[in-house]
Amino acid sequence: HFYHLGAVYDLEASAEAMEKANITGTKGALEFAEAVNAGCFHLVSSIAAAGLYRGTFTEDMFEEAEELEHPYHRTKHDSEAMVRANGRIPFRVYRPGAVLGHSQTGFIDKIDGPYYFFKALQKLRESWPRSIPLVGIEGGYINVVPVDFVVDALVHLSHQPKLDGRCFHLTDPKVRRVGETLNVFARAAHAPEMAFRLDPKVFAMVPEPVTQSVQRSKPIQNVFNQLLRDLQVPRSVLQFVNYPTRFDSTATQKILDKAKIRVPALEDYAWRLWDYWERHLDPDLSIDRSLRGAVKGKVVMITGG
């Protein structure tokens, strides 16, 4: 068995970095696997290989991917295409959803998906009374899975006979929207929830000239960009808030069910993810709050008699 997990999953990474890791790296891994006569090449791809497909993307779909303009989507799709077209070595492809921390410990060494909004939830908890309802957006679809499920599923599937050439969605069969998912984490964080969530279709009713005028407004853009910086939300993440794709994992679930490997309910372990993030990954933990840290890199004028 040869497992290839090396990739760039950072949405903020440059297109060149993604090309080098996701495409050039996969090419090198394939060549090495052939050189050592590996029995099967196991590619850990991503649901990103579907691009921004509108509808339900099944495990036997690949070429149907749509809107691969973002380099992350494109390089994940292209690396998968390379493995499929190789023809000289058996392969299996695994497409995990957005990978979260361990469902039993909360441990994670890289943030993805909902983690980008944890700082915003934390600030809301500190400044907004839970008794006052919030209005938010329902958003598109989001599929999240804990890392321990991904590992258990990968190990089991890779050792089952007669599955070469297949693709497996390591995803949550429960369909969730972004707004619903953020509310789960809001409860875990003891932050106010979005009592009212607006469907994205509501904004489609706004006349296009009005939308374009707002988007081009320099003052509005400046305020919006400052808000993103304060909440530490990468701008690139926002394009996925209305993610249009649902993922079907029926075939994979049938295999995993026999081994009693199932995706745990997010509600059951979200508190562990939040607790671990707040104790270990919160960016504010690394801020130097001493006098030295407060004045470092600044020009300070001391006045007085």
Predicted regions span which residues?
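Conserved catalytic Lys-bearing alpha helix of Rossmann-like short-chain dehydrogenase/reductases
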Residues: I23-A29, T75-V83, F117, V150
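Conserved Rossmann-fold NAD(P)-dependent oxidoreductase catalytic core, especially the SDR/UDP-sugar
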Residues: Y3-G6, E12-K20, T24-P71, F91-R92, ...
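Glycine-rich Rossmann NAD(P)(H)-binding loop
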Residues: V99-Q104, L134-Y141, R166-R176, V184-R187, ...
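NAD(P)-dependent short-chain dehydrogenase/reductase
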Residues: G55-T56, E69, R84-I142, V147-D152, ...
